[in-house]
Amino acid sequence: MIKNTPKRIQFTGGANKVTERALLNGLSDKNNFRNKIGGGIISRGGQARHHTATDLAQEIYNLFQYIDKGGNKKLYAQRADGSVHLATDSPPATTTGNFGAEALAAIADTKAASASILDGNLLYSDGKRGHYAYPGASQLVKGFHVYKGTAAIPVIPEIGEDYTNEVTDSSTSRVAVLNSLNTLANYNFFLVITELPANSITLTMVNANGTAATLAGQYWKSDGAWASMSGLTDGTALAGATLGQSGAIAWTHPSDEIPHYQFGRSGYCYRFNVSAAIDSTVSVSQAVYTGAWNALVNVWDGTPAPAIEAQVYRVNNLKYEKYGGSSINISDLFDGSGDYVHFTTFDNICGFYIDTGNTPNIIKATITGSSDISFVDGGTGDDYITWQQARFQSEGFEEGQSIVITNTTSNNITVKAKQVTSNKIYVNSGLLTAEVNKSATLTYDNTGGTFTLEVWTGAGWTAISTNLSDDTATASKSGWVTFPRPTTAQMTQFNGSPAFAYCFRFKFNKTTSRNAVISIMTMPFFDITDWGNGYCNGTWRGRPILAQDKYPQWIEIGTSYRMNCFNGLDSKPFEVGDDGRDNRVLAFVNFFQDLMVFQEEKGLEGGCITLIQGYDTQTIEKSIISNSLGIVNSKAYAVVDGVPTPKNPKASHAKMVFFISREGVHMTDGQGVMRISDPMGLYFDTTDTASCIRRGYEDKHWLNYDKLHKSIRIGLCTGTSATVANVWLVYHIDTGTWGTDTLGQAITCMANVESASGNLPVLQYGGASDGFIYRLNTGTNDVGAVPIAVNAYVTVEIDGEGHKIDARTLQLRCKAQSAGSITPSLAFNGNTTYQDETVRSMTVVTANDTYRVNDFPINRKLTDHISIKLSHNTAGEEVYLLDMALLDAEGKNVFKN
């Protein structure tokens, strides 16, 4: 209150739009002013267009800056039509012409978007399409492998040299070795794996190639095969020699690209091969990539998932044998019959791994003795073959095999094994002639087999044959079976299985061996569009966090430092809130080591604020900060350090989250919530329809932290007809007080951006309803089509509190300046008409004066209440008010300490 202040009245208090002026003893209005750290208040800086023209005069929904791995600063603006545009010039530079090129196409009915950054990748969500991701430039690759084979390259290679660490560090002495890399026809290539889709890979060469050769590239296509890149340009070529210099290999983004699994990694795979063998000393020290904006995909984490169960059907006994996925008996499956191996999986798959362990399907066994194989005529009993090395079983011979015998005198025949031990093979009586210590050759050959793979599609079984690859040679060795994604697969509870799952089956065209037992692991794939449109996103503890509109109260916590992996044990779906209400998640806020989640407010119960804690997906838990308050949209919050609190007004370390709800402006410390907007309560008073925030326009409000002035700036869409923000508030954090702004251009969103030049590291920019982006806190005018003066005024209410005020003179002190004036005016006893208006200079009287004093007469002897309004509304000028005093007829201060 005024009477308890020092003799001079300070202006650092706050405006009050709720209390009747006659009841106030302090400020009622404080418009377009900012508190100064050293005392006093100064008119806010102006705002100026970042670009000179706009191709579409529509509202800017949101504004955000993205800094990629290469340090490139990119300012993006989201327009009302849903498109996203990239600034041609980074702040503070201005652009002649339009703001910048379109980065993401328009789509109707988007909300104010959310954007976050994880490991240099941008994540974007606007509520009307899937989440989008963008790697920017100079993003590190996730895999770099060199393959030099001697036979046909399998779909999932098992050999190769991994140079990922060498090309992703800063050392030039650690390199990827491409020495004498040969052609693809000779089974040579190098492979690059990226987390997000790439359209350019830049290689830094240490030892360059000088041999004439060209480069070709392939990507993994949705049909389950490699496809040639379109529009490939080789920036590493020098004088006809690829890899002859450092440079970028670029190509056109294919629309049919999907992730792939190579060398134990799952991601986007790019295979490169040369047309001729290159030099014997060629090496690469770094590989980085660039990509474009692409829809986010849920990429498999690379950990094979076990099959749920298997059922083996045998025609000879007309029944199914049930097994767990880790031990499946496929012995004696007959060729050409209806013997099938069925297996189920919770997720659709594009491949499965058959692990044969020590019990493969034996398709070939051969030995040649060294004068140590003998043939025994068993008389009336079984004949048999003996081998002194006693390795028949370990070499793959077993009962039931047809064995071809050669290199003998009398036994060059084909026999069928009845029983096999380590040193004997028994056959039917009368087949063998006695021979001793021969160097005979015994061969069992069942090679050349294939198997048929089918998938359940709802109406029946559908064969998968195109691009089917079997690296197991019909389960004779461990390996992958891969195929294109079966888009028509349907789930079923196969043959009474308790699991509703996808079902696949395969059969062999040759009889399997007697003791074949396998396990099956699967290669799943996922469709992120099953979750609906991407509504908002965030990051937490190095993980991407997603919210969708299909399951609004559920969030997806992704794999650690994987931008696009939301499956496997290191990821987790998690329900926020406390009671299952389907309120949409609108904002994620990192708060210390925790994650604060805001949901929308709707119905009688309102919204919810959840605090998620934990070190990983296994230790995660939640607590409820509020089960009634929520947030209006994803651009209506700010996290601020060093906030004074009522319990500790001098605190310099308190962290607070400021946010707008339909109930007002609040701040939370993660434990409780405090409403701070009471002095501006008319904007949240539903009985005041002319001033209250407008229902149905919640997405138009905004809140952000002004790092220059250490204040919270707010835009509200109020009244009955406004369609964009039309009221702007300022919360002065240091004093916990309020002010208002009147803006020459309707700012609809705000962002702090890192400056590309100049002495100020952080600048403030805002998007406006006219389609322009404005720099804030700059100059003295609001410069749009024409300059508009910053109309700054402060109104001080002085109440006698039951006493008459005997004030004859208003003494005002201003910071001295080279030009400018201040206009005081007075109103008495609650009258809203100001009078005694006069204009006084703020320029210096005497050289080196630091402030200017002006005395204004008060033409009223005694009064109950005085309203003093100090105004400045001149283009090209600012006003800096220090303090004021009221003097009586004797020149003494009316207010005593």
Locations of regions flagged by a protein language model:
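Small/polar beta-strand repeat architecture
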Residues: 103-109, 221-267, 272-309, 313, ...
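Autoprocessing Asn-cyclization modules and mimics
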Residues: 138-197, 299-435
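Surface-exposed loop and turn segments in beta-propeller and other repeat-based domains
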Residues: 567-579, 625, 680-695
